[in-house]
Amino acid sequence: MFRILRIHGESMAPEYQSGDFVFLMKVFRKGLKQGDVIAFENRLYGTLIKRIEKNTDEGIYVVGTGENSLDSRRLGPVNRDKVQGKVIWHIRRR
């Protein structure tokens, strides 16, 4: 299953910028590894896109590349059930 999302915000800049599009592919939990960029659902902030820092028994730790990224340093680990997919393709806005 595939999904297209539009990036809002600068938490993953400069790699992903506001207005860019990403294509997600649903993956099995074991298919996620360090360095992958994933989209996941957060109950307070909606869908977020971040890079996997580490995948542990307690959850997935994610980081953003932007200066003030809202990531696991503030939110804690991501529950694997909240992962919507892995970014497989990126289209930059012009």
Question: Model regions: which residues?
Answer:
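Extended hydrophobic leader/signal-anchor segments used for secretion and membrane insertion
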Residues: M1-R94
